[in-house]
Swiss-Prot record:
Its EC number is 1.5.1.5, 3.5.4.9. NCBIfam families: PRK14178.1, PRK14186.1. The gene is folD. One of its GO terms (cellular component) is cytosol. This is Bifunctional protein FolD. The keyword Oxidoreductase applies.
Length: 283
């Protein structure tokens, strides 16, 4: 079975558009991008287009590649203090001269729709998330939409990044899976992967996951965005080789990526609702 993230995202965005229209709210998202990296610019444009589609206002702050950490922090502070802005997204990665940790920590928790602030992650790891990071939460939505069982299943997450691997593991744990996180220092990696009922790969290595690493009938979630030797977009998973062995699998493109943006829109609307009702549970 192909887990069609694009189809799920289309459904979620249409439902969100209706919900926003019925709410009478006008959520607003601000993006901050530093430099002119083509991939980052493309991702930001996609996010603004999604905002327009569902009825979320958006503004973009563009800073030069040589911007200092202090300049980025000043931009974030202005957005924190703007009562008309509900969500703030700092497009990553930031240039090497900018302290990414300081910038992420500076975003007001109640506007942290990307889910990377320590307050957001702390709530996630404690089992009471408000804003979960968009990619892992989008994956959970795909699993839910396709009714993939999680409770009691063995889940293996390959990759321990703070934006995908660790929060993915936390969400699966919160859903009562038995979770293992693997990384570059894991011994007998293939053995660990073969035990997985749900296998999530987020390591950024083109076609790294082959059929010999996948349990028959497993659900395989491919978070990777890479290029193969021919320059063609591909994931961490060798899709053609694995699809017949897996019980369910996300493609690249069209799998996890669209759900990341849909979840960002949902988080932004949630931030607007929380502000309207005066809910301060984010902190």
């Amino acid at each position: 079975m192909i887990l069609d993230g694009k189809a799920v995202s289309e459904k979620r965005l249409e439902l969100l558009k209706e919900e926003i229209e019925e709410s009478g709210l006008y959520p607003r998202l601000a993006t901050v991008i530093v430099g002119e990296d083509p991939a980052s610019q493309m991702y930001v444009r996609m996010k603004h287009r999604a905002c327009e589609r569902v009825g979320i206002g958006s503004i973009g702050i563009e800073l030069p590649a040589d911007a200092s950490t202090e300049q980025v922090l000043e931009a974030v502070a202005r957005l924190n203090n703007d009562p008309d802005i509900n969500g703030i997204l700092v497009q990553l990665p930031l240039p090497g001269g900018v302290d990414t940790t300081r910038v992420i920590d500076a975003v007001a928790p109640e506007k942290d729709v990307d889910g990377f602030h320590p307050c957001s992650l702390g709530r996630l790891f404690s089992g009471t998330p408000v804003f979960a990071p968009c990619t892992p939460q989008g994956i959970m939505t795909i699993l839910d939409e396709y009714r993939i069982p999680i409770r009691g299943k063995r889940a293996v997450v390959v990759g321990r990044s703070i934006d995908v691997g660790r929060p993915m593991a936390a969400l699966l744990l919160n859903a009562d899976a038995t979770v293992t996180i693997c990384h570059s220092k894991t011994e007998n990696l293939e053995d660990e992967m073969r035990r997985a009922d749900i296998l999530v790969s987020a390591i950024g290595k083109a076609k790294f996951v082959g059929p010999e690493m996948v349990k028959e009938g497993a659900t395989v979630i491919d978070v990777g965005i890479n290029q193969d030797e021919q320059g063609k977009l591909c994931g961490d998973v060798d899709f053609d080789a694995v699809k017949d062995r897996a019980g369910a699998i996300t493609p690249v493109p069209g799998g996890v990526g669209p759900m990341t943006i849909a979840t960002l829109m949902e988080n932004t609307f949630r931030a607007a609702k929380l502000r309207t009702c005066g809910n301060n549970t984010v902190r």
